[in-house]
Amino acid sequence: MAFQECVIEVAQDQAEAWSDALFDLGALSVSVEDADADTPDEQPLFGEPGLEPKQLAWNRSRVVALFGDDADPAVVVAAAANQLGIDPVPPYQLRAVEDQDWVRLTQSQFEPIRVGERIWVVPSWHDAPEPDAVVLELDPGLAFGTGSHPTTRLCMQWLEQNLTPGETVLDYGCGSGILAIVARKLGAGDTVGIDIDPNAVEASRYNAERNHVEASFALPESVSDASYDLVVANILSNPLKLMAAMLSARVRAGGRLVLSGVLERQAEEVAAAYAPWLPLTVWRSEEGWVCLHGTRP
């Protein structure tokens, strides 16, 4: 089956309305992109939990809609414009998209990732690259965290170099469960992963089972306020600052805290947020991101 892709350039305040209208009128999928992407005018657009986004769309947005080969995109675009009260119909571009083996195509884009001296993240369709490797079998797409992002790599490298076998571990904001799983594979004792997203909790349980690892994963309200030898949180700077008191309380006296998801320019303010409970210093940085660590007195 072939598909038809329709691309419409719209104003910032019209992007969401166009997306909804095209969906209502039969589009199989709709995405919104920066119309100036890959040009000097490209506009970074991102937010962070705990902060209201300053802007919800790009100044010039490109709405990309996908239709089946039996649809008439011209009729749909005209109907959407009429529904939105837009006249004349804005210009748009059409192109044919051939059907492919999308699973095979996606798999071809992911290779095993070497994270540390011995740690490898390996998709299920690949074999372990080294016989003595610490292998995490993990497929992309289940939840955030596959080892490809610098913050995940930094945390995994810290665990490889600093984890003491038998230590209890809390992975707060576990995502795919990757840090909890690698901690167990490196010899950690009781390990708990917490995430506010039920899908992440399910993905973590699935990944732990696939990797033959015993670890508990749950939503925050389902876990006791126990303290741990090691607490790891790879989130973002603003949530980390908001949770400073809570995360610090989860670290037992003499235990250690490891934080990432923090840009180099944010490290000082994150460390300041935790200063009432424990000192944090930069352990390592990569591609503008840092890993902070410290020991609770």
Curated annotation (Swiss-Prot):
Binding site for S-adenosyl-L-methionine: T152, G173, D195, N234
Molecular functions per Gene Ontology: protein-lysine N-methyltransferase activity
Subcellular location: Cytoplasm
Keywords noted in UniProt: Cytoplasm, Methyltransferase, S-adenosyl-L-methionine, Transferase
EC number: 2.1.1.-
Family: Belongs to the methyltransferase superfamily. PrmA family.
Official protein name in the record: Ribosomal protein L11 methyltransferase
Protein's organism: Cupriavidus taiwanensis (strain DSM 17343 / BCRC 17206 / CCUG 44338 / CIP 107171 / LMG 19424 / R1)
Source organism phylogeny: Bacteria, Pseudomonadati, Pseudomonadota, Betaproteobacteria, Burkholderiales
Gene name tied to this protein: prmA
